[in-house]
């Protein structure tokens, strides 16, 4: 009889996971304690939105284990640690500690990582099918790498759609603004003949009689969106290239193995087999 894994994890399952991946458990424990400390601090200061984000992070921390237990997928320790660090860096450091504002390239670093990880995910999905003897499905290394790249870029585009929707519907500022000193637009053409007109050397902008004080024109999200997609592109290209050589020279790509999930080998239930019919 086939047993389906349960969630939350049973004590035996959790102990086995700790023994199998001690580094992952250590990182998980340290980050979880830090998030709990932030949660308590947020509640004391009556910052309930921050407290909600902390609770969300604690749930997301369980996601890798949930996937492994319920879908029969084995995540490499390196990949799992990066996922945990990514969640912490994006939500706790980025949002609550304002790293997105303090460090200008924090967002770009996270989007580059996203491109890399999503390419690894797309690569794994196709590669698992490619190696499954029960499925008549065999693709060349270049096609698998290209599909992984496209998967990563699609996720990146969908995320930008989400950011745009949040900004439009809920007046958020997920697509960060950029101060520029030059703009070009056909709307500035007095002849209305679709001729782009450029204004250079912008040092001040007045809105409804109020000086903004940014030292330039405030671009609304375009530069941020394109930069996010570009660094996502870089991350996707890097992993797709690594994945290509991993398939081409099967078994020699140690770097790729550290990021590619695999199907867990199911062990037969000997107790069920020994039962009399």
Specify the residue positions occupied by each region the protein language model found.
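Short, Lys/Arg-rich, polar N-terminal cytosolic tail immediately upstream
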Residues: 1-21
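Membrane-interfacial alpha-helical segments at the cytosolic side of multi-pass membrane proteins
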Residues: 113-130, 168-174, 234-248
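Interfacial helix-loop-helix junctions of multi-pass membrane proteins
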Residues: 96-107, 156-239
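Membrane-interface helix-boundary motifs at transmembrane edges
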Residues: 67-78, 134-139
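Short, highly charged, low-complexity non-transmembrane loops/tails of multi-pass membrane proteins
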Residues: 253-274
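Alpha-helical transmembrane segments of multi-pass membrane proteins
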Residues: 61-65, 86-91, 148, 152-159, ...
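Membrane-interface helix caps and helix-loop-helix hairpins in membrane proteins
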Residues: 43-48, 70-73, 96-106
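Cytoplasmic-side transmembrane-helix entry/capping segments in multi-pass membrane proteins
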Residues: 55, 74-85, 108-111
